[in-house]
Amino acid sequence: MIEVGIVGGSGYGAIELIRLLIQHPNVNIKYIFSHSKQDQPIKETFPHLEQLTYHYETLNSEGIECDVIFFATPSNVSKHIVPQLLSKRIKIIDLSGDFRLTNRATYETYYGETAASQEYLNEANYSIAEWSNVNAQTTQLIANPGCFPTATLLALHPLIDKDIVKQDNIIIDAKTGVSGAGRSLAQHVHFAEMNENLSAYAIGKHKHKPEIEQYLSLLAQQEVKVTFTPHLVPMTRGILSTIYIKLNHAFTNEDLHNLFKDYYEDKPFVRIRSLGQFPKTKEVYGSNYCDIGIYVDEENQTAILVSVIDNLVKGASGQAIQNLNLMYGWKENTGLLQSPVYP
């Protein structure tokens, strides 16, 4: 049994961590930190957690004694605290973007904030769980991937890895629910602004664009650029990413479908849909699954991939726990066996 703490405990990502970790057989939640809710019972903020007796605490790195700290905070928080915690040999799983990008200048361009020191960016293990090499002996700091990159990279990984696509014209059209914007008030997520509305945002400058490009470039061993456009849709949870990519070999639908089935055969959280079927966001709601549908336009050899995840689970807290399991050598689905909630 290990003891963990959660920083940012009043946000959606943290609440999902709590929901999942209280069901984990190998984890005890010792701390839940929130600067804005100090000393308040958690059930006052979230009445659906009436059974929990935790009170929010203020983070003081000197007095913390536990095995792992999860940061479920916005960017520009964890990078100021993580060095002190690492010096105490506390392992970190950071759900924010502070340690995802290895290039400080790129971070500062897209996030508009000063980057973490290069020492800690180099130490961080960016961990798409399906391809992770984390372990308890050598891994101290995990940069948990973002939601859009998770949905996108799981779909693209087999094609880039097998070098069967043209890497200069990857188009990603992604839709997300409003929980991805967090709990803070903002005009674009007010009901009157969002309801019966669909909008593209952060075109060409979304923080997840360089994250996707960084991972694909490392995998391809050459620079990969993408065209990435996110859209906000009037639903609470979910991401649907539709990806268009030119193939550099002649493939039939059956060929590409079989490639994906073989590639993900031993990955419990990636489900490849039957040929001709495509996933919907409701079909992974509340779960750690990523469902992928595949189509080949055989006339012009373009692959069209449809990937769906729950942005708060596989796109955040669920993958963080999956990475925790991998780090400690537990079965990666430990504590993550929840079926999707439907309808």
From Swiss-Prot:
Pathway entry: Amino-acid biosynthesis; L-arginine biosynthesis; N(2)-acetyl-L-ornithine from L-glutamate: step 3/4
PROSITE patterns registered for this protein in UniProt: ARGC
Location of this chain's protein in the cell: Cytoplasm
Function: Catalyzes the NADPH-dependent reduction of N-acetyl-5-glutamyl phosphate to yield N-acetyl-L-glutamate 5-semialdehyde.
Active site (record annotation): 147
Pfam families in alphabetical order: Semialdhyde_dh, Semialdhyde_dhC_1
Record's keyword terms, sorted: Amino-acid biosynthesis, Arginine biosynthesis, Cytoplasm, NADP, Oxidoreductase
Lineage of the organism: Bacteria, Bacillati, Bacillota, Bacilli, Bacillales
UniProt organism field: Staphylococcus saprophyticus subsp. saprophyticus (strain ATCC 15305 / DSM 20229 / NCIMB 8711 / NCTC 7292 / S-41)
Entries under PANTHER family matching the protein: N-ACETYL-GAMMA-GLUTAMYL-PHOSPHATE REDUCTASE, CHLOROPLASTIC-RELATED, N-ACETYL-GAMMA-GLUTAMYL-PHOSPHATE REDUCTASE, CHLOROPLASTIC-RELATED-RELATED
Keyword hit for rRNA-binding: no
EC numbers on record: 1.2.1.38
Major subcellular location class: cytoplasm
Name of the protein in question: N-acetyl-gamma-glutamyl-phosphate reductase
CDD domains (alphabetical): AGPR_1_C, AGPR_1_N
Protein family according to the UniProt entry: Belongs to the NAGSA dehydrogenase family. Type 1 subfamily.
GO molecular function, one term: NADP+ binding
